Amino acid sequence: MKILAYCVRPDEIDSFKNFSEKYGHTVDLIPDSFGPSVAHLAKGYDGISILGNDTCNREALEKIKDCGIKYLATRTAGVNNIDFDAAKEFGINVANVPAYSPNSVSEFTVGLALSLTRKIPFALKRVELNNFALGGLIGVELRNLTLGVIGTGRIGLKVIEGFSGFGMKKMIGYDIFENEKAKEYIEYKSLDEVYKEADIITLHAPLTDDNYHMIGKESIAKMKDGVFIINAARGALIDSEALIEGLKSGKIAGAALDSYEYEQGVFHNNKMNEIMKDDTLARLKSFPNVVITPHLGFYTDEAVSNMVEITLMNLQEFELKGTCKNQRVCK
């Protein structure tokens, strides 16, 4: 298959070279993010590959349909940037990478929890200013806390297994589909019970219409005073304005955000010499008890390699069978 890969980072190039040969593809790589303005570049190709922050709206999809594209493979698990109704209408087969490396995100999540509970980022900032005092840096021990995991699929299970080594006081979880393996470590509770009982709430659920802004004013009010919130999943699971109010009131002791609901166009881009136009993000950055990372929980050597390989496997399967096990929508 002849493939055009958009938004290719330097760290992906070797993987594309190696796996395109393995799976018999001809792949051209460009750094441009996919969107309506560059969709015309797909003319002459059979399929394209994109990333999670690319603009895959109706306009862009119609343009690649006019170019003859029938296959679109995103190198991510998340697909919230893709207009599935338009893809189906235009007969474009879409596939994603549902499990590239659950360990990458789970390990990062544990790191975020330690960063919050031991105030590591705040301590590092103070040391940069030659402030070596201990005042304000007292932390809490994980073994005295209850962990609440929302979403116990592949990543959530690995998160649970990771925290189990710290001897947490208790581990509870919520998922509409209970994981039998997770039951070896956690007790499943209702969502309200998780909000009420957990000292640390960590999110590992996909974004759906039903759970959009699940962490909002009402749910935060149900939480313990001094709760820690971690989001290494989808940004729009959290209502950012409600989060800010919770931080200002002291209800929330700290938040770690590896995803943010308005991250598109900001995360994974260098904005050092630009004025911050997003007032909400600027306010979140101003809190000493908020850790923000640019959606890099997935970002390990193994995960990057797997994301590229599985993407090319998906496209090969489309070519050979007309369908794909990781298919999300087709005509």
From Swiss-Prot:
Q: A GO biological process this protein is involved in?
A: L-phenylalanine catabolic process
Q: What is its EC number?
A: 1.1.1.110
Q: Which InterPro entries match?
A: D-isomer_2_OHA_DH_cat_dom, D-isomer_DH_CS, D-isomer_DH_CS1, D-isomer_DH_NAD-bd, NAD(P)-bd_dom_sf
CDD domains given in the database record: HGDH_LDH_like
The alphabetical list of record keywords is: NAD, Oxidoreductase, Phenylalanine catabolism, Tryptophan catabolism, Tyrosine catabolism
Pfam families from the entry? Answer: 2-Hacid_dh, 2-Hacid_dh_C
Its pathway, per UniProt, is:
Amino-acid degradation
* Catalytic residue positions: 234, 263, 295
Q: Give GO MF terms, alphabetically.
A: D-lactate dehydrogenase activity; hydroxyphenylpyruvate reductase activity; indolelactate dehydrogenase (NAD+) activity; NAD binding; phenyllactate dehydrogenase (NAD+) activity
Q: Which reaction does it catalyse?
A: (R)-3-phenyllactate + NAD(+) = 3-phenylpyruvate + NADH + H(+); (2R)-2-hydroxy-3-(4-hydroxyphenyl)propanoate + NAD(+) = 3-(4-hydroxyphenyl)pyruvate + NADH + H(+); 3-(indol-3-yl)lactate + NAD(+) = indole-3-pyruvate + NADH + H(+)
For the ligand (NAD(+)), the binding residues are: 154-155, 175, 205-206, 211, 232-234, 258
Q: How does activity depend on pH?
A: Optimum pH is 8.
Does this entry carry the keyword DNA-binding? no
Q: Which residues form the signal peptide?
A: none
Query: What's its job?
Result: Essential for the reductive metabolism of L-phenylalanine, L-tyrosine and L-tryptophan. Catalyzes the conversion of phenylpyruvic acid to phenyllactic acid, 4-hydroxy-phenylpyruvic acid to 4-hydroxy-phenyllactic acid, and indolepyruvic acid to indolelactic acid.
The family classification in the record reads:
Belongs to the D-isomer specific 2-hydroxyacid dehydrogenase family.
Q: What is this protein called?
A: Aromatic 2-oxoacid reductase
> Source organism lineage?
Bacteria, Bacillati, Bacillota, Clostridia, Eubacteriales
Gene (UniProt): fldH
